Amino acid sequence: MSFDGMFTYGMTHELNEKIMGGRITKIHQPYKHDVIFHIRAKGKNQKLLLSAHPSYSRVHITAQAYENPSEPPMFCMLLRKHIEGGFIEKIEQAGLDRIMIFHIKSRNEIGDETVRKLYVEIMGRHSNIILTDAAENVIIDGLKHLSPSMNSYRTVLPGQDYKLPPAQDKISPLEASEDDILRHLSFQEGRLDKQIVDHFSGVSPLFAKEAVHRAGLANKVTLPKALLALFAEVKEHRFIPNITTVNGKEYFYLLELTHLKGEARRFDSLSELLDRFYFGKAERDRVKQQAQDLERFVVNERKKNANKIKKLEKTLEYSENAKEFQLYGELLTANLYMLKKGDKQAEVINYYDEESPTITIPLNPNKTPSENAQAYFTKYQKAKNSVAVVEEQIRLAQEEIEYFDQLIQQLSSASPRDISEIREELVEGKYLRPKQQKGQKKQKPHNPVLETYESTSGLTILVGKNNRQNEYLTTRVAARDDIWLHTKDIPGSHVVIRSSEPDEQTIMEAATIAAYFSKAKDSSSVPVDYTKIRHVKKPNGAKPGFVTYDSQHTVFVTPDADTVIKLKKS
């Protein structure tokens, strides 16, 4: 648990410095659990994310772009009514709990001044965002409702008094003394890190393990000293926001994690840290839920085609015996005089072989020798004719596999909007039936929305995240002399630099983006081809997004999320 009470303390301090006194200019609710405040503060526009997601609950300033629904949810409408246009007077923390309270001064419909408190409770699957009337301490509404039958201690329903979750009888680390530490920790029994969590509020196992590690040989002298030093770092806002990666797993915190033996990366702020840590995680989780049926369908279709190829290859093996059937027919015809009906096999000399060996030819005893010879000629003709057909079927099935591999890759990095476009593509390709509900109007065709990036030198880079976007970008948006990029022989996005002569750094940055949005995302030294759009062609009858190209150059890059985040235009 990295977003513990200590982290909440640090984030509360950071937000007070950055947005206290700021005006809430817009409110959006892009997803069920997430609310975005657009805030004008300290002379610039900022976006504040409030998330009550069961797995990714958090609060921080974000630079990420979020897609808004065409119709705002009811909770979003309520927030707009009560606090849009209001000013954030201050932000405070409830003790050292993972609860942040935003004090917002606004005006109601008739112009009277009102003060609202917005509680953001960061508590895993119990996370919530609750708006209250500050004067009356009455709940106006919450993102999630909590009825008396669900929780006997507190109710979260409009009109009810707001009540904080039950307080834990623990010591505040920010006021703790050496005596407090020695009085509550037993050095003879039990794990010390667990005891620290049990006795001090706002402290997570991550913090406690760090304290024990810094104490070295933890005893009554070293551990209190290490704990008090860490408490002081938090209290005095001496934060070192970082992500430490150990065996591929990432940990984030506001203090250095010396007990983790891995690669650490520092950030300028806690918000920047969280923006990087959660980049794509919550969205991938949402997409996974939305696209479960789609992903299952695509994987099954790929499997069907793979099985089809196996069967066709067996048929091809049989078909390749055509020459043998022809030989049997000719040898039987040459030896009709020595055969009779009822024979089960024929022992004949193979005159076509230099060594003239005797071979055995199976016969149908119910047929005459002449009929047996004709049967082998018929088998020969069928086998010969089927080779071309079977090879064509194998080629088509292989194309289907490549197509579904492309879709699997696209689903792995898709946004909710991308999912809709992939579904539409499968409907148009007659793979799926349309999901149109009764009475629902047919949506008008629309141009896909492309992701936009800006290179260090200021050039625009456009990215297609699915086949519809790829086709739109490559065949309609890009100019003939723009530079087109794609991972070499690997499913991935089409990427276009809006320039005929980009600098080398821009090419490498665009190639990094192309590698990141490809099947080779987790690889190193990924080959990426680039060429001018004029050398990219779509074959007649090809599936959406499929192209051929020539006159390409190849560069090798390592996919890097930090580069993608840095270059993305919000």
From Swiss-Prot:
GO cellular component terms listed in the entry, alphabetical order: RQC complex
Protein's UniProt keywords contain Transcription regulation: no
Single GO BP term: rescue of stalled ribosome
GO molecular function: ribosomal large subunit binding; rRNA binding; tRNA binding
Region named HhH domain: 179-281
Renumbered residue ranges of the record's region NFACT-N domain: 1-173
Sorted UniProt keywords: Coiled coil, Protein biosynthesis, RNA-binding, rRNA-binding, tRNA-binding
Gene3D superfamilies listed in its UniProt record: 1.10.8.50, fibrinogen binding protein from staphylococcus aureus domain like, ibrinogen binding protein from staphylococcus aureus domain
Regulation: induction: Up-regulated under secretion stress conditions, possibly in a CssR/CssS-dependent manner.
Coiled-coil boundaries: 279-336, 368-430
Region (NFACT-R): 446-570
Spans annotated as Coiled-coil-M (CCM): 282-434
Subunit structure, as described in the record: Associates with isolated or stalled 50S ribosomal subunits. Binds to RqcP. Interacts with ribosomal protein uL11. Displaced from the 50S subunit by thiostrepton. In crystallized 50S subunits RqcH is variously associated with A/P-site tRNA, P-site tRNA and RqcP, an E-site tRNA or A- and P-site tRNAs and RqcP2(YlmH).
The record's note on its domains: Has 4 domains; N-terminal NFACT-N, central helix-hairpin-helix (HhH), 2 coiled coil domains with a beta-hairpin in the middle (CC-M), and C-terminal NFACT-R. The NFACT-N domain contacts 23S rRNA, the A/P-site tRNA anticodon and recognizes tRNA(Ala), while the M beta hairpin binds protein uL11 near the base of the bL12 stalk.
Miscellaneous information on this protein: Activity of this protein is best tested in a clpP or ssrA deletion mutant; ssrA (tmRNA) encodes the SsrA tag added to nascent proteins in stalled ribosomes by trans-translation, which targets the nascent protein for degradation.
Protein family per UniProt: Belongs to the NEMF family.
Protein name according to UniProt: Rqc2 homolog RqcH
Organism listed in the record: Bacillus subtilis (strain 168)
